[in-house]
Curated annotation (Swiss-Prot):
Gene: rpmA
InterPro entries, alphabetized: Ribosomal_bL27, Ribosomal_bL27_CS
GO biological process, one term: translation
Family matches, as PROSITE patterns: RIBOSOMAL_L27
UniProt xrefs under Pfam families: Ribosomal_L27
Protein name, UniProt field: Large ribosomal subunit protein bL27
Amino acid sequence: MAHKKGASSTRNGRDSNAQYLGVKRFGGQVVSAGEIIVRQRGTHFHPGAGVGRGGDDTLFALQAGAVEFGTRRGRRVVNIVAAAAAE
């Protein structure tokens, strides 16, 4: 049996905190103003109509309606459409 730990074991033993990133409200889901739609690092998704962007690139709803994912000029965008129009 080893009587010393070894060099690597004393250097390990730490982990980063979970970031909880990703899409929080999917296409077709109805949201109210202020709800977070996507948590991201960088602009993987860009804000469209009725969507704002926070300082950490989080996308959130500026108005109530249904979430709609699409593309514009080759970029993925998130829009909010009127809930009645989405049904």
